[in-house]
Each structure stands twice: as C-alpha cells, then as structure tokens.
Amino acid sequence: MKKIITAVALCIAAGALMGDVLNVKVWRGEKLAVLLSDEYHEIEGAAPGVSVETGAVLPVRYNKSPHSLEYALKADRAVLGSREPGRGFAVVTAAPDAKPGRYEFGQLVVTVLDRVLPQPREWKYYLDLWQHPWAVARVKGVKPFSKEHYAAMEPMWRMLSDAGQKTLTVTLVDQPWNHQCYDAYGSMVVHRKSADGKWSFDYSLFDEYVEFGRRCGLGPHISCYTMCPWGYMVDYIGPDGKVVRRSAKPGEPFFDEYWGDFLVDFSKHLESKGWLKDTYIAMDERSPDDLRYIAKFVRRVAPGLKIAMAGNRRPSEFSDIEIDSYSQAMAHINQPFLDEVPARQKEGKVTTYYICCGPDKPNTFMKSGPGEAFVCGFYPAACGLDGILRWAYNSWGSDALNDMTYSRWTAGDVALIYGDGSPSWRFLELRNGIVAAEKLRILREAGGQDAGIKELSAKFDAQKLIRGDNYEALRKAVMDFVNR
C-alpha cells in the first residue's frame, strides 16, 4: 500500500538519511518511532513481519516560560494517519518472528537485526509516569469513573503500558498534591467515622480502578498517594454525613487515629485481593522527619505494605528507614548515590531517578531540544539505575489538545500525551530511549562487550548532562552501539 505524507522543518531521529533514503535498524520485536525528512516521502510496500504506519507531528502552542505571554509553536502532537501539514513520522514495527534482513518501503529502508527485544510487559526497565484519571474525565466531558470515562482512558493507559509502565497511580486522600493541578485529584477510598468513634472504609472505587488499570497492563505495582499530602489535609465523612477536612500531620495524635485503623483494614483488603505484595504507600518530596515517622508507623501497623519516595537525598541519609522504592532528583545524583544502588537491587528494592520542573535540560519540556527525551529515557541503563519517574503523563492545563501552556511550570512539564489520546513526540522519543536502555541491558547480560558498554556509559554523567547540549550526538552514539 502506498502512503504519501508531507513533513516540514525537522531533524532525523533514530535513523540515517542517505540521499533521499532513510535507513533505520530495529531488533525483532521492536517498535520504533522515526521522524522523516523535510521533503515528500513515499513510504510504500509491505512485508511479512514488518509494518510501517505514517502520520504527522502537528504544531502545538506553548508559552516560552512560566507566566510569560510570549508564545511559540512546536510540532509535538503525533497523529498516525494524519495528512495535515506538520512533521512527517513513521512507526516501524518488527514482529518477534520477523526474518532478519533488509526491507524497502520506498524511501524508508528498514534493516531487521538478528536480536530479539522482549515485549514491553517483560522489560526490566522501571517506568513510573504518574497518571491523572480526573483530567481525562474533564477533557472528555464525562462523569468520573463512568463507563464512558473508562472507555476514554483505556487507549491512553494501554499506550503507557506499551512503554513498559510498572506502576498504577492511585489516591488515598483528596488533593494529595494540594491544588497544584488544573484538575483536582479525588480520593479512591472513602473514610467514615461513626458517632462512637469507629472508622470504616469503602474500597469500591479503588478496587474498580486497580482492576481496570491491570487490564490495561499498568503495574504490577500500585502507588498509593499518600499518607503525607502537601498541606497535610485529609477528609472523612463524619457521623452527620458531612465531609470533615482537617490536618493530619505526622507525629500528631490525629495522624495516628486517622491512619492506624485504615492501614490495618487496608492491608487485610489488599491481601484478600492478592495485591498486598505490590502496594506502596508513596510520598513525594517529603521531609526526612515526615518520612521517618510515616515509614516507622507503617512498619509497625501494617508491615506488609511497602514505602516509596521521590526525593533529593541519598537513601543512606534515611539510614533507619527501609525505603522499598526510591527515586532521586537528577540534579542531586552523584557517584556516592550510585554506589548504593547495587546493594539495594540485591535486596529487591527499586531505585530510579526523576525529572520534573527541573533540571532545565535534559528534560521533556516543549522547549527541550532534539535528543533530550531520548537521553532521559536511556540514562538509567548507563548508570545502573532501574528506570525513570516523572510527573506527569496527562495532567493537562485548560486546552489539552492545542496548547501545552501551564501557568506554574515550564510548558510540557505536566503532560506527555494529548487529550485525544495522541502521544507527544516527546513521549515517543522517551520510549525510544527506554527501548535502547532495554537493548543495552540485554547486551550487558549477554557479555562480551564490557569495554564498549563502559565507554558508552561514561558519556552519561548526570552533572555533565545537565550542563551539556549535545544530546543528538549522544543519541546517535547509543543507537549506533545497540544496533551494530
């Protein structure tokens, strides 16, 4: 079948342009997104085991800096099948049983190498992009957690699963991040307190959503936010049926009252569902004192639950706390931190890094340059970390389709997909980097390339990456190595 698309003003990703022919290399089982040149490209033909889909990366508006009234356009919304003016792109997919060799699709030449990439659910890479279901409901104009809402979320969540996502973001309280999101997060658990002071809990929505997320392929881990919300405020329904909102700060008597009975009951409920071993009480950039109190409280009251934390300190600074999943801010990664990772991995603990409103680069902002998102995805493989954490996958602003502006942070910080379910090019490049990371893991485990892997990994020092700007060259070095 013949497909013709138009592309404008772009750079080539994950391929080499030879004259008017684009050459790309893939492993069997791989899916790769590539940008096309700034000319008309004829992509034609079909082959058993290899498919090529094409589309356009459409322009999206964004402000150049937070609170700025200066706007720009950037091609970012990747729509398969689109023939609208925009950058052309193709998604190349090689089946696990594809025959190695050269495949010509007009001006696109695909070389399938004799190596096999496992399916995303089998990747060891730990991807943790936080989801926001309420944002989907608002954008689609449907009732939260209605049949229509789940139908709208499903393709978005399955696309995230296809990138190797290992966690499902759930909420234990209203507004776990206070009011920083455009759409409010609600609680998936209802807390009730009777006149005699007894507590009861309704897990109906929690169960429904976790089951849905798992059907979409998200998990197995369940990240529960949080016992330490920003502002410390929690809600419950009082004896008169009215919602009570009050502070529950770690160390105060009401904290123990509010969370004590809940943790015991929650653990029993999770055990009955078979989810206890996969569930984390998750916290975001909380103080050492808060984390210490909460972790000890959880270990005492509900020892089957795990603790997850995103912070900017080495795990050893919480030496009296067992943190099962720790994510370090990229700006604070140094060799002493990395030296602790192997011991944590031997204990079955997860250690990742995260980017958010910082660093300025490399990142996945609208303003980020070519290669940055790829580098962010690949970086953990080079330094021995398990993966990447990022807020957020889909916490959109007012216009989820045409404008990535968000008043508080750099444009693109809050979302990697669009309200119609289209991925951003940033997300596709992040996924390309994750795929390359998984390839490097496979090559490392196979042995025989230690010197080359060491040389490549040396290029990925976090502090040098933050100060650097040659991300396209790094991407090329990675792709050349894992595809040779």
Pin down the residues of each PLM region.
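Aromatic- and acid-rich polysaccharide-binding/catalytic face
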Residues: 308-334
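Aromatic-lined carbohydrate-binding surfaces of glycoside hydrolases
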Residues: 40, 63-68, 81, 92-93, ...
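Ligand-binding face of N-terminal immunoglobulin V-set domains in extracellular IgSF glycoproteins
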Residues: 20-104
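Catalytic-core region of carbohydrate-active enzymes that cleave or remodel glycosidic bonds
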Residues: 325-409
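Hydrophobic h-region of N-terminal signal peptides that target proteins for export
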Residues: 5-18
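Structural detector of well-ordered beta-strand residues that form the stable sheet scaffold
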Residues: 223, 306-308, 352
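Catalytic domains of carbohydrate-active enzymes that cleave complex glycans
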Residues: 1, 233-236, 247-279, 283-313, ...
